[in-house]
């Protein structure tokens, strides 16, 4: 998918990019490739692949109608090089984006990236989701939490749902069908008062299958969740 294909596909979906937004995606690509030589950000560095498998893939929840250009508080867990939240932010500037990542070098990259792209209302924090999930400044504060290929739902639910307001939504982007994952996550979702409201499949323009699972938080998360760092992964609920 060339940049021009990317612009055209978005326009066909009703999203006509301004010259500023096109420049932001171009700068994003260049900085991603440049920084990838210093720290491991991505295995995908060829321009057409980045536009398809990072940029287009990241904004899929918007294209599929699951997010609006509103000043909602969005948290991205384990965003790595900023996916999916920063491409979403470029497309929908009204979003207020917070990223938590466990690697400080990635936070350095994201901080510089946001400055170079001129993004406002973006916040980056270094640390573990399990620790921030017990911090009152973060817990129960977000309208949406996104996670792209972070962990299976059984683990992911404990890392994300505590951050949501009641009625808030987890948007999980997956490359594989989530049916088996959701079966395994039934107990975790029950304990965390999360309800799957949508399990959506779609295709990238090249025909690759992708999946979005949306979980709504129904009640306040019990205080003991999330458990200490590492436990959700070692002993899933």
UniProtKB/Swiss-Prot annotation:
Disulfide bonds: none annotated. GO terms for molecular function: rRNA (guanine-N7-)-methyltransferase activity. It holds the Pfam family GidB. S-adenosyl-L-methionine binds at residues 78, 83, 129-130, 148. GO terms for cellular component: cytosol. It is an enzyme of class 2 (transferase). It is found in: Cytoplasm. Its EC number is 2.1.1.-. InterPro entries: rRNA_ssu_MeTfrase_G, SAM-dependent_MTases_sf. SUPFAM superfamilies: S-adenosyl-L-methionine-dependent methyltransferases. CDD domains: AdoMet_MTases (cd02440). Keywords: Cytoplasm, Methyltransferase, rRNA processing, S-adenosyl-L-methionine, Transferase. Its main location: cytoplasm. Specifically methylates the N7 position of a guanine in 16S rRNA. Belongs to the methyltransferase superfamily. RNA methyltransferase RsmG family. This is Ribosomal RNA small subunit methyltransferase G. It comes from Streptococcus pyogenes serotype M3 (strain ATCC BAA-595 / MGAS315). The lineage of its organism: Bacteria, Bacillati, Bacillota, Bacilli, Lactobacillales.
């Amino acid at each position: 998918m060339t940049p021009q294909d990317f612009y055209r596909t978005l326009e066909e979906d009703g999203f006509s990019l301004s010259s500023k937004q096109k420049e932001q995606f171009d700068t994003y690509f260049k900085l991603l490739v440049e920084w990838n030589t210093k720290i491991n950000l991505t295995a995908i560095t060829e321009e057409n692949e980045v536009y398809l498998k990072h940029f287009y893939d990241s904004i899929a929840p918007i294209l599929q109608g699951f997010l609006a250009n509103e000043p909602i508080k969005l948290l991205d867990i384990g965003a790595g090089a900023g996916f999916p939240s920063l491409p979403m932010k470029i497309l929908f500037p009204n979003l207020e984006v917070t990223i938590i990542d466990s690697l400080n070098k990635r936070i350095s990259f994201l901080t510089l990236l946001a400055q170079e792209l001129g993004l406002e209302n973006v916040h980056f924090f270094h640390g573990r989701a399990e620790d921030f999930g017990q911090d009152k400044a973060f817990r129960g504060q977000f309208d949406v939490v996104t996670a792209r290929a972070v962990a299976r739902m059984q683990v992911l639910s404990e890392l994300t749902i505590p951050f949501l307001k009641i009625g808030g939504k987890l948007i999980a982007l997956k490359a594989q069908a989530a049916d088996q994952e959701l079966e395994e996550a039934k107990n975790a979702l029950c304990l965390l008062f999360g309800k799957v409201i949508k399990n959506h499949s779609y295709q990238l323009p090249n025909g690759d299958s992708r999946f979005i699972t949306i979980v709504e938080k129904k009640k306040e998360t019990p205080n003991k969740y999330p458990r200490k760092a590492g436990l959700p992964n070692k002993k899933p609920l």
